[in-house]
Amino acid sequence: MDENGASFQVLCLATIGFHHLRGPEIEHLFPESMDFPKEWSILPFLSLPDGAHSSEKDFVYFTLPFPNDEGTVFGLSCTRQLNASSLKNIPSDVTRSSVQKAVVVITTSPPFGHIKDNLDIVTNAYFSQGDFSNLDVLRDFFHVLTRKEQDVHIALNINLKSFLCEWRQNALVLLKVLLLGKRILVYDKSAERLGNFQYSLLSLIPCMMSHLQDVSSPSAHSLEKSLHKPASLQTSDKRSLLAYTGFPLIIFGEGSMFSPYTPLQLVHVLEAKSSTSWLAGTTNTLIMLNQNKMAEVIVRSDTHQIEFVDPTIKNLTSLTYTDKSWMEDIISRVESSLEMELPGFEGSDDWIRNQFELYIFGMLATVKYYNFLKKQDDSILSQYHYLPSTSCISDYGETFLLEWMKTNTFRIWNNIADDDLFDVILPKHPCKEEHKVPISARIATLFSAVKITPKSRDGEDEGSKEPAV
């Protein structure tokens, strides 16, 4: 599975309508012979979000448990409303001036790119008919999505440049909060903006977007059970290096969940004692009024504000001087390249991901190095001909690193990542990189020219102790 995209399967297509007495309900389902899973009974409430009547069009991202399995499916709903007078045949149960419906796609991976674009087009065509009983356009769309010969890959298609320019240095604060496994509630009147914000944040973490199979339920932890410490490292293989470094990081393991849109009907899951960590989004003001009882951090993606319900988290995730300098440099480079759309170009979305990849790689190497130093006596350390600088610890923030080492994410990662990781990847904040070296050269060094060298002590092999990165 590729980091810039994930192969996927379309499981079903549905239409959701809003009945003035019964509320949101499923009207049509493709394939029509599908045995609808009981685990998806919440689908109508996910597809037509709270406040949907206040906008003509919106997109909703949501997650559901995979039927009879430890896994997750991903939903994308395109909501529209139409003036009832525009209908050719007004159904007897339509008693309001407007009709509100959604067309929904359920897939095995987050649906972005052309799936979203095509869903928008098809939904518009379905509404433009003025006859909701004519399902031909939906039936044809489903057949196109499920053609066996179609090899579908979904590009992330997330605008990280906008995300970074809007959130600026707080983008790194939010990443630190996420890494610490806190309970994060995101609010926005726009469900589309709500989902885009959360997926943008997740996409900053290497391998995250292709390893979201456990996010729909706090009880799911199949990914953790499948991980193991690699027996070897192939320096020319990026996947091998990622595995050696301990990826994927289990941000949403047992006790955690990711719910990009959360209706009132799911609030009890967030409030449960078993839900110790989550990232959840809402458009409902009632949930916001009650947020202090369950969330530790409140994010307003519409106004770009962060509220720390627990003030200690603000201190733990505050940026170091080195963090701030690094973010200033990245933002400057992004803003100077806003008109450039070439993939991989300095300031592009791929380039931004590479920067945060280097940041997290350096952080993980720093944690291993920190623990190595703590285990050794000064008399032993003095025998080494070379050891990396310890400035990396303060550059990332010692209190932040210590707090991260209390998380479930750290526990799982520490068991599978090699203890000598800092021999391969230099424990160094990316702000300390030599800016004269092009990013392409640094990435090439990281993934193509890694060489493992033993720590050299007196009387032992004195191979170069300088890590490759």
From Swiss-Prot:
Keyword Protease in annotation: no
One Gene Ontology cellular component: endosome
Residue ranges occupied by any dDENN domain in the UniProt entry: 334-437
Location of the protein in the cell: Cytoplasm
A Pfam family annotated for this UniProt entry: Avl9
Listed GO biological process terms: post-Golgi vesicle-mediated transport
Keyword line: Cytoplasm
Entry keyword Cytoplasm: yes
Location of the uDENN domain: 11-150
Family stated for the protein in its record: Belongs to the AVL9 family.
Function: Functions in the late secretory pathway. Required for the generation of secretory vesicles as well as for actin polarization and polarized growth.
Entry protein name: Late secretory pathway protein avl9
Organism for this UniProt entry: Schizosaccharomyces pombe (strain 972 / ATCC 24843) (Fission yeast)
Lineage, uppermost ranks: Eukaryota, Fungi, Dikarya, Ascomycota, Taphrinomycotina
Gene label: avl9
